[in-house]
Amino acid sequence: MILAIDTATDWIGLALHDGAAILAEFGWRSRRTQTIELAPAVAQLWGRTGVAPADLSAVAVAIGPGSYTGLRVGLALAKGLALAHNLPLVGVPTLDIVARSVCRLETDLVVVAQAG
């Protein structure tokens, strides 16, 4: 079971993937309050699915580009979970996440994002 965390933008995303399909996902717009929203949202995701941290096989987290504070919050939670449960931690570039969310084809993609 993989826990995926994306806090790179104002749209926060969490997902649990069981190796074959997405078991559950949860997303919301954060008004720069990731520090107080993220951990309770992960707990809520686990509560809805019955998944516990011990069931995880890895943690994946967005590594940017993106909101400096948002990235730090997501990375801190992901690293804490990975260290506490001896799990692999996988960093995923934000632009890869954006590209795959709009196109599932195995082709070259270019993502352009407005900065600032």
Region annotations inferred by a language model:
Residues 9:
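Short, glycine/acidic-enriched loop or turn micro-motifs at the edges of active sites
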Residues 3-4, 12-116:
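Nucleotide and nucleotide-moiety/phosphate-recognizing core
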